[in-house]
């Protein structure tokens, strides 16, 4: 019996993944995922809400069931149709090729090396000596509130010693 001859009851008895296997076996060619779902919706007279509840599981099953193979964007076929070499070609990741730069290219202002912009942006964020723009205003507000309340915060000497060591290490670099 062809899937197009199924009744609503027969559609309800089967999972979408089993129906997809039957549909792909009948067609003998890869099919778009959305076409499959639309076909199931039409045959089973499903509402949009009914389809939505089943589609999530269906898509998960398609990806985990070894009988199916994604052959492109939203295209699915049966793994049995393809040789091992074909499968490797279909699912092999695309490798991007880059030109190798020599020292002259690296000095060119037209070429930005990977990560170069990020480093410059990070350097802009670092406070420099006498740079009042980078003072954290939130810290100033907290200090003002403490002064107004008459609270005295004593510095943690151990913390300051560690901070001094950290500053010394940064200067050495």
From Swiss-Prot:
Residues 14-81 form the HTH HARE-type domain. Residues 113-173 are annotated as: Disordered. One of its GO terms (molecular function) is DNA-directed RNA polymerase activity. Residues 115-173 have a biased composition (Acidic residues). Pfam families: HARE-HTH. GO terms for cellular component: DNA-directed RNA polymerase complex. GO terms for biological process: DNA-templated transcription; regulation of DNA-templated transcription. Gene3D superfamilies: RNA polymerase, subunit delta, N-terminal domain. The keyword Nucleotidyltransferase applies. Keywords: DNA-directed RNA polymerase, Nucleotidyltransferase, Transcription, Transferase. RNAP is composed of a core of 2 alpha, a beta and a beta' subunits. The core is associated with a delta subunit and one of several sigma factors. Belongs to the RpoE family. Participates in both the initiation and recycling phases of transcription. In the presence of the delta subunit, RNAP displays an increased specificity of transcription, a decreased affinity for nucleic acids, and an increased efficiency of RNA synthesis because of enhanced recycling. This is Probable DNA-directed RNA polymerase subunit delta. The gene is rpoE.
């Amino acid at each position: 019996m062809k899937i197009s001859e199924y009744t609503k009851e027969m559609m309800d008895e089967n999972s979408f993944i089993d129906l997809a296997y039957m549909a792909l076996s009948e067609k003998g060619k890869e099919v778009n995922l959305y076409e499959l779902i639309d076909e199931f919706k039409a045959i089973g007279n499903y509402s949009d809400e009914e389809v939505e509840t089943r589609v999530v599981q269906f898509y998960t099953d398609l990806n985990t069931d070894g009988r199916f193979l994604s052959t492109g964007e939203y295209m699915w076929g049966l793994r049995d149709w393809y040789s091992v070499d074909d499968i490797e070609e279909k699912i092999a990741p695309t490798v991007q090729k880059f030109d190798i730069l020599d020292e002259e290219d690296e000095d060119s202002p037209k070429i930005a090396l990977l990560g170069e912009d990020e480093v410059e942006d990070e350097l802009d964020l670092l406070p420099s000596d006498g740079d009042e723009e980078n003072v954290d205003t939130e810290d100033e507000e907290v200090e003002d509130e403490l002064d107004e309340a008459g609270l005295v915060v004593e510095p943690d000497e151990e913390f300051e010693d560690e901070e001094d060591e950290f500053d010394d290490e940064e200067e050495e670099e």
